[in-house]
């Protein structure tokens, strides 16, 4: 197969592992930055064309047809990356995670709405319009409070407000810069730990527990969190699979937290990193992803 990965940083561990796995299984993979693409729509065939410009001095060239596309772009490239994905979808190419599912996952508030609508348990959450005064929301959420920007990643844009007045001050400051935030219950009984599940289709292929270090409430590995193996019950695995389906994703990293009221889904990531979960679980997730693409690209082509 001829595969394409959409990624701004081809040297990242996840990108390199996927390229190695594809090569090992006899496939060719290109890695291209979606921000170097330009898209053409035409009434006459071919209706969907994608051109690529390597640099400011080079002449754009028409991209060939691919058997499958793997989106691995970050939050700053969401708009263009999803536009490129939509173009490939228009061409009938199999995309591992659709453009709409990617957009669902990248909007934290929309994803919470989709999760709860599908019956997936999530923390109590609030999102308010720009004309709502921050102090008016405080009686409706517990304290301490978690504050999150709508499209952050790797723990960036996540703040713990210990007291109600702190939450008000932080929200008012962010409002001045036109940055919207959602409020969420802080699950104190979980301490500084959460769980990352790697879901592929109808299966949880790997899990790990992440533990924040040195008083850091965020357990993200990018924030220095430690990881260790963890075993989930069948019920907990089903919640992770259900969350992935609710967002519309084929492959996802689902973040879970154990509360006194049961398991809660914190977030569903459309482009989860492979490094720490592969090293912690000992599972070759990159190879599993290529296997999944082989099967589903074949089904898509029939």
Curated annotation (Swiss-Prot):
SUPFAM superfamilies assigned: Glutathione synthetase ATP-binding domain-like
Binding site for ATP: 148, 185-186, 194, 218-220
Cofactor(s) the protein needs: Mg(2+); Mn(2+)
A cellular component annotation (GO) from this entry: cytoplasm
Protein residues bound to Mg(2+) 2: 267, 269
Any one GO molecular function term: metal ion binding
Pfam families to which the protein is assigned, alphabetical: RimK, Rimk_N
Gene Ontology annotations of biological process type: protein modification process; SOS response; translation
Top-tier EC class: ligase
EC number: 6.3.2.-
Record's cofactor remark: Binds 2 magnesium or manganese ions per subunit.
Keywords: ATP-binding, Ligase, Magnesium, Manganese, Metal-binding, Nucleotide-binding, Protein biosynthesis
Residues holding Mg(2+) 1: 255, 267
Binding locations of Mn(2+) 1: 255, 267
Binding site for Mn(2+) 2: 267, 269
Signal sequence, renumbered to the chain: none
UniProt KW Magnesium keyword: yes
Family the entry assigns: Belongs to the RimK family.
HAMAP family: RimK
Official protein name in the record: Probable alpha-L-glutamate ligase
Protein species of origin: Haemophilus influenzae (strain PittGG)
Source lineage: Bacteria, Pseudomonadati, Pseudomonadota, Gammaproteobacteria, Pasteurellales
């Amino acid at each position: 197969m001829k595969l394409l990965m959409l990624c701004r940083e081809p040297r990242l561990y996840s990108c390199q592992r996927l390229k190695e796995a594809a090569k090992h299984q006899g496939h060719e993979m290109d890695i291209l930055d979606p921000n170097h693409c330009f898209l053409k729509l035409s009434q006459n065939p071919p209706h969907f064309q994608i051109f690529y410009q390597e640099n400011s001095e080079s002449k754009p060239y028409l991209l060939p047809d691919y058997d499958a596309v793997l989106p691995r772009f970050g939050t700053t490239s969401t708009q263009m990356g999803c536009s490129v994905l939509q173009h490939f979808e228009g061409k009938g190419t199999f995309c591992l995670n659709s453009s709409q599912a990617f957009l669902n996952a990248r909007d934290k508030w929309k994803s919470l709405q989709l999760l709860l609508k599908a019956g997936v348990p999530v923390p109590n959450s609030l999102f308010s319009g720009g004309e709502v005064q921050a102090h008016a929301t405080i009686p409706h959420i517990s304290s301490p409070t978690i504050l999150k920007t709508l499209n952050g990643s790797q723990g960036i844009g996540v703040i713990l407000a210990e007291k109600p007045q702190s939450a008000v001050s932080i929200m008012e400051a962010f409002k001045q810069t036109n940055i919207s935030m959602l409020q969420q219950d802080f699950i104190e009984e979980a301490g500084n730990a959460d769980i990352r599940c790697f879901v592929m289709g109808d299966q949880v292929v790997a899990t790990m527990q992440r533990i924040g270090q040195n008083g850091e409430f965020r357990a993200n590995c990018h924030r220095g969190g430690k990881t260790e193996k963890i075993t989930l019950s069948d019920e907990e695995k089903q919640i992770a699979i259900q969350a992935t389906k609710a967002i519309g994703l084929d492959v996802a990293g689902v973040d879970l937290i154990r509360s006194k009221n049961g398991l809660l889904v914190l977030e569903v990531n459309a482009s989860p990193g492979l490094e720490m979960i592969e090293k912690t679980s000992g599972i070759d997730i990159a190879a599993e992803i290529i296997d999944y693409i082989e099967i589903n690209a074949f089904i898509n082509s029939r």
